[in-house]
Amino acid sequence: MAASGMLISNPSNVCFRKPQFSCSLKPKATVSELGFLTSQLSGIQISPSPLFPIISKPISAPLKPSLQPVARRICPFTGKKSNKANRVSHSNHKTKRLQFVNLQYKRVWWEAGKRFVKLRLSTKALKTIEKNGLDAVAKKAGIDLRKE
């Protein structure tokens, strides 16, 4: 059995005293005082001050995902992307699979910029660049090579 209080005396003669609390549960402010307080605050107008300009930017930055984004398997020059195909077993059981584009990282000489540009492109786009030139293929695809 649990009881609140202090044990005074020996264990054979048990006596519990009531604990004395110093805080009272009575409200300190009366209704008239609260009414007076609200009447004082009723005339105050809260508006932006020239001393404290309104901050247009959010104070906290949005949370970013902890995982880094994976590079998409799409060729930026030709627009080629993965093909959905079926893997067919001997018993003709079909399961879905992806046939990825043959993307390669390649350093290509850019004649107009007089420098090498490192690109991730498909082997088909590489053949097209060798035939037509990097500027023509990039212009047709809408790619700005100055950023790369």
Swiss-Prot record:
Secreted found in the keyword field: no
InterPro entries: Ribosomal_bL28, Ribosomal_bL28/bL31-like_sf, Ribosomal_bL28_bact-type, Ribosomal_bL28_sf
GO terms of molecular function: structural constituent of ribosome
Source organism superkingdom: Eukaryota
Compartments in which it is found: Plastid, Chloroplast
Family matches, as Gene3D superfamilies: Ribosomal protein L28/L24
Transit peptide feature range: 1-71
The entry's keywords: Chloroplast, Plastid, Ribonucleoprotein, Ribosomal protein, Transit peptide
Chief place of localization: plastid
Keyword Chloroplast part of the UniProt annotation: yes
Pfam family, one: Ribosomal_L28
BP GO annotations: translation
GO cellular component, as recorded: chloroplast; ribonucleoprotein complex; ribosome
Free-text function comment from the UniProt entry: Component of the chloroplast ribosome (chloro-ribosome), a dedicated translation machinery responsible for the synthesis of chloroplast genome-encoded proteins, including proteins of the transcription and translation machinery and components of the photosynthetic apparatus.
Oligomeric and partner information: Component of the chloroplast large ribosomal subunit (LSU). Mature 70S chloroplast ribosomes of higher plants consist of a small (30S) and a large (50S) subunit. The 30S small subunit contains 1 molecule of ribosomal RNA (16S rRNA) and 24 different proteins. The 50S large subunit contains 3 rRNA molecules (23S, 5S and 4.5S rRNA) and 33 different proteins.
NCBIfam families in the record: L28 (TIGR00009)
UniProt family annotation: Belongs to the bacterial ribosomal protein bL28 family.
Protein name: Large ribosomal subunit protein bL28c
Taxonomic classification: Eukaryota, Viridiplantae, Streptophyta, Embryophyta, Tracheophyta
Gene that this sequence comes from: RPL28
